[in-house]
Amino acid sequence: MSATKKYEMMILLTEEFNDSELKTWAFNYAKALRKLSASEISVISRGKRDLSYYINNQKKGNFIQINFSSMPKYVDNFSKNLKFDSNVLRFLILNK
């Protein structure tokens, strides 16, 4: 069994979310992480910002930071879920 590692994930979402929808979206993904045996989950909203260039015809985006601990095999599964979410413009998962 592999040991858990700490991760930091930055997610760029479309600008179409209001504050309550953004919290709901982030809470649902935090629950999904919990189901994949993640621990020490912390969600931080970094706000809506202008983008340097258009991504999928979007000039603004909402940034979400999620810090968590998990086994590497579950992180791969979670990143596959993010790839298929139409609200996600970009995401990056880093080891801490």
UniProtKB/Swiss-Prot annotation:
Keyword Ribonucleoprotein: yes
GO annotations of cellular component type: chloroplast; ribonucleoprotein complex; ribosome
Keyword Ribosomal protein annotated: yes
Sorted UniProt keywords: Chloroplast, Plastid, Ribonucleoprotein, Ribosomal protein, RNA-binding, rRNA-binding
Pfam families noted in UniProt: Ribosomal_S6
Disulfide cysteine pairs (residue numbers): none
Function: Binds together with bS18 to 16S ribosomal RNA.
Family assignment from sequence similarity: Belongs to the bacterial ribosomal protein bS6 family.
Name listed for the protein in its UniProt record: Small ribosomal subunit protein bS6c
